[in-house]
UniProtKB/Swiss-Prot annotation:
GO terms for molecular function: nucleic acid binding. NCBIfam families: PRK12497.1-3 (NF009150), PRK12497.3-3 (NF009154), YraN family protein (TIGR00252). This is UPF0102 protein Adeh_1910. Belongs to the UPF0102 family. InterPro entries: Restrct_endonuc-II-like, tRNA_endonuc-like_dom_sf, UPF0102_YraN-like.
């Protein structure tokens, strides 16, 4: 397992990469098709771009070493949501446009003792970056 989220930047980055890899595998096992990873634009970043049936899904992955300070999903606020939406818009415009069904999900990965815990929050925020109802 990667270093703690509260440590140095390299440890946080390693934890994030490990969480993203685990989230991608978890989603793929459930039938999601992974189209892209770590899509960066000047306006933001999307961790995973997937297809869930006919729906284009943009996934923000959040990882922590414990849930002691709340779940990783709680760290996705409106500003982060808007940045994901902006990067997702750029991606969609280059891959079929905005006329397709689009959803914004969060996958929370908590590393601790034993197996990592993966939680999926479909439609975690809307196209304006506002939190959904989990």
């Amino acid at each position: 397992m990667a270093g703690g989220a509260g440590g140095d930047g390299d440890g946080r980055q390693a934890l994030g990469r490990e969480g993203e890899a685990l989230a991608a595998a978890w989603l793929a096992e459930r039938g999601f098709r992974i189209l892209d990873r770590n899509h960066r634009t000047r306006r933001g970043e999307v961790d995973l771009v997937c297809r869930d049936g006919e729906v284009l899904v943009f996934v923000e992955v959040r990882s922590r070493t414990s849930g002691a300070q709340g779940g990783p999903e709680e760290t996705v606020g409106p500003l982060k949501g808007r940045r994901v939406v902006a990067a997702a818009t750029d991606w969609a415009l280059g891959h079929g446009g905005l006329e397709q069904a689009i959803r914004f999900d969060v996958v929370a990965v908590t590393f601790g003792d034993g197996e990592p815990r993966v939680e999926h929050f479909p439609a975690a925020f809307d196209g304006d970056g506002r939190p959904g109802h989990w």
